[in-house]
Amino acid sequence: VGNILMSDDAGVKMYGLPPMTLDMCVAYSQGEIGYMIERNLRNILREHGLTRHVVSMISQVVVDEHDPVLQNPTKRVGRIYTREEADKLAAEHGWIFKEEIKVEGGWRRVVPSPAPIDFKNAALVERMARSGSIVITGGGGGIPVYVDGEGMLQPLEGVIDKDLASAMIGARVKADELYILTDVPYIYKDFRKPTQEVLEFLDYADAMKYLEAGTFGEGSMAPKIRACLSFVEKGGQKAVITEATKLEDRRYGSKITMHYD
């Protein structure tokens, strides 16, 4: 989405194109992500002589228009601006900017990241998946929308955490297992410290204790663990966090369940 926002910004500046709203940028990214995954997946299935229906589905994820986080946006998106540019854009569009710590004198737009509470087309996704189709959905966390007083869907300027969205979608379609792929094969206690320890199995209670103690990085592993807990809390049997290249190797991956077996 950040790249799309920067391309959009260039189009506005160079050619006078109308700016895209953030929900449209998320939808744009979903189309790209879905296309890339679907095309490659179809090719892989063909290489293995397998015939399966593959479908990419736009996902509108419902959020609460009164979510408190909407009053305190923290998710940085788009390019870095000067203070003068940021002030001008804030006046023109009502955007909120925060100073960029890593770049002196730089400012970036910040948007809220509301919690996902529902997923449109959940019943359809479940039906297609149970019939044997491979469904690609939830790209970029989904397009945030809210339900207005008349029951109509309205866009909301924000981005949804992709792991929380995946957990919610998984629970809504009654999936048994959730897999979150990252760049490490396990959850670690004291990550990259001399006392580093692999946590191969976690139940809900122990995972919550670690989160409350601040054991995991808020910008990395903690949100993924919260997503896993949300999934098993809503009926999922097991959530796994592992490295993408280790997905097929059962020796790797941290497993999270409601209770230890």
Where are these regions (language model features)?
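C-terminal catalytic "cap/lid" subdomain
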Residues: V1-D261
